[in-house]
Amino acid sequence: MAMPSSFSRGGFVFVRRIVTRPVDAELEDHDSMDPETFRQMDEAGRFALSWDAHNLRYALPLSVDTDLALGKTVVANVSRHVVAEARDKYPSCAVLLITAEISCRAERLVRRGRENPDQITARLARESAPVPPGVTPIIIDNSGLLAIGVTAFVMALRTIAAQE
């Protein structure tokens, strides 16, 4: 998803996740890493945040800490299961929960073609887990047109940045 040019010059940083999955530019712009290298780097503390999901390992690079120290607004895509850890490490972080109706999510996962039906069912069951207690996310319903979801996302980011 392309962001308006105002975000590139407005102090926003969109973090590229590190994932133990080959790069597929059509699905997600991420950095790929083999599982063993990932494990070694994780054990050495070379990630800002890491977690497991969907039989893969994910991480945010240490550059997150540098960007935050420079006063930038950092935007990262993480699992809701790592939100508590993120809030512990970054107490001022805001949580945006982007969701969609379950039928819409199922259709999108099937169309993406990365997972078999059993994996999709398990993923949908896992995604219904709530955010941790004490976290009040800004909820964005992405069930409709992409333009509507993007507009809601942009508005939420601008609101959060204005509060910093």
Can you say where each PLM-predicted feature lies in the sequence?
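Conserved catalytic network of the ASCE P-loop NTPase/AAA+ motor domain
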Residues: 66-69, 87-90, 131-133
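ATP-dependent small-molecule kinase phosphotransfer cores
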Residues: 13, 17-74, 78
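Short glycine-/polar-rich loops that comprise or flank the Walker A/P-loop
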Residues: 10-12, 89-94, 133-136
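Short, well-structured alpha-helical segments
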Residues: 117-128
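Conserved nucleotide-binding/hydrolysis micro-motifs of P-loop NTPases
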Residues: 19-23, 81-82, 100-106, 145-146
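A conserved segment at the C-terminal end of the G1
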Residues: 1-9
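NTP-dependent small-molecule kinase module
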Residues: 107, 114-115, 129-164
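Conserved phosphate-donor/acceptor-positioning beta-strand/loop module used by diverse small-molecule
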Residues: 73-79, 88-112, 127, 140
